[in-house]
Structure formats: structure tokens, C-alpha cells
Amino acid sequence: MSKGILKVLQPEGWAPAKGYANGIAARGEMIFVAGMIGWNSQCQFETDDFVAQCKQALQNIVATLACAGAGPEHMARMTWYVKDKKEYVSRGRELGKVYQEVMGKNYPAMTLVQVADLVEDRALVEIEVTAVKP
């Protein structure tokens, strides 16, 4: 499958990835978005809810991509750092809806890592993105 400058890499015979791509080939201008957490534009947390913080972090990514004239459709790689993988898994459906609401049906190569802690004490998730635009 190809979406312009991004080509999804799907090895022959593999089951389709659900909610992410196994790999992405990209060409164009690279954009690196630092790890975004679930606080607002004034660096204030409005919630301690995991899914709500994920939504805010995703919105922060979209806002940062827009500064480069890019959007979710340009994402090639996304890395999630979460404090509690069990909450991530148990709230997967809810999180999937929030993801599609903010990012649409754009699924980059994705990794999720559980970490012992994040720099900001109230942060429950941190997400970084690499994007490529023509």
C-alpha cells in the first residue's frame, strides 16, 4: 500500500498489522517531533486520566506537525512511552477511538514501551513522531 511519499512495508505472507505499520519507506523532508506529553500549550495538566492525556499528547503532535506544514498523514514513525502498559491494553478500544479522532486512519510504524517513569511527574504517556513530507 502506498500513500504518496509513504509506502507501507508488509512482508509477504505476514498477517496484517492492526493499528500500525510493520515498516514505512519514505522520501522527502524529515520532521522530528519531540516526545509530547498530555499537557496543554501552557505546560499545564488538565487531567490525570490516561486516555485524556493520550488525546492531548496526540493533539500536541498535530499542532507541532502543522508548524512544518505537515499533518498525521505524513507520520512515518511513532514511539509511545507509557508508565502502565496494563492500562494501555485495557483501554485499547477507547484509545483507538481517540487516536482516529485526532490522527485519522494514519498508522505509522509504531512502538510502545513501558517505562518506570517520565520526567514530568503527572505525565502518564509520552509520544514522539518522525514525519516525512514532500
What are these model-derived regions, one by one?
Residues 1-76, 82-134:
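N-terminal presequence-like segments and the immediate start of the first folded domain
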